Amino acid sequence: MKRACLPGLALLTIGLTLAAPVEAAPSCQPGENNRSASTGLVFSGGGAKGAYEAGVALGLKERGVSVTAVAGSSAGALNAALVASGQEELLVKLWREVSNDQVYRLPWSMGLAGLLPGWITLWYLDQVGALFDLSPLRALTAEYVDLARIREAPTRLFVVALDLTSGERRVFTNRNITHDLLVASASVPGVFAPVAVDGQLLVDGGLMDRAPLLDLLELVGPVDRALTVVGYGDPTPLAPPLTLRRILERTLELALPYQIVKDAELARHRRPDVAIHLLFPSEPLFLRPLEFEGERIARAIELGRKDAHACLDRLGG
């Protein structure tokens, strides 16, 4: 397939979880004015931490930054879809109004299993495909994401999912994205059930591609200029009680940043002409991946917006 070329692409990669400090290029250092450069966004997900991404997207739009291409996996896929359609305000509205029961629910049978003797519970867990039901997210995605608008949008969209059957990554674009594919990209195996699409069992693309930076660089072709941002902090300590849910959330938080940073290093090696940075929250979010409501969501949105403005101030764009 012939790759399209987007000259003057500025690449902004948004990371959501806080990693331990690593060696990386300086964040948002003053340099050439990138105001006229087009911008590519890469969203990494992180469950409820996607609220931070929404704030960043809104902050960029408020400053007149033109997004030419956007890629996402996991929760970042939904964010990427609404940015591709030019609906950053709607994206923020979604995050401000979302609640846990609009994203997932515990199947009634799972609750019943907790009342059964241990050996029966183990048998039950061998019969089910996931801890939580993502049906509410399907309804939410259908309500907010206008597929026709995405297909007509000038902003190029890339969404990553993983096919459990073949073990291969799948990249979907404006032309073939669907609501089911967006849900599939957020379906962490074991936590949420795989989504069957055209004979494939699709799950969270972030398992193999936390932030699809390399996909974006490959699919958009040569890049002349780049607007990039990086920031990092320390992970929030795991507090008791050590429930299964908290352990799963903590595992996801620790697994996310390492691959994102390694991919950025690889991208810098492959594309020395592009300055690539990772924008992480400037302050701890104190937001758990499955915590889709409350003041912390609102705070994450505002922090993302503030960080986007601060980054552009330093870049002169």
Residue ranges of predicted features:
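Short helix immediately C-terminal to the catalytic nucleophile in hydrolase catalytic domains
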Residues: 53, 79-80, 213
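Bacterial N-terminal signal peptides
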Residues: 7-18
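Conserved small-residue
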Residues: 46, 56, 76, 141, ...
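Helix-rich "cap/lid" substructures immediately adjacent to catalytic or cofactor-binding pockets
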Residues: 25-70
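Sec/Tat signal peptide C-region and signal peptidase I cleavage site
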Residues: 20-23
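Short glycine-enriched nucleophile-adjacent loop
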Residues: 77-88
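A short alpha-helix-loop-beta-strand transition element characteristic
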Residues: 101-106, 145-156
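Non-catalytic peripheral regions of patatin-like phospholipases
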Residues: 35-39, 88-140, 164-165, 169, ...
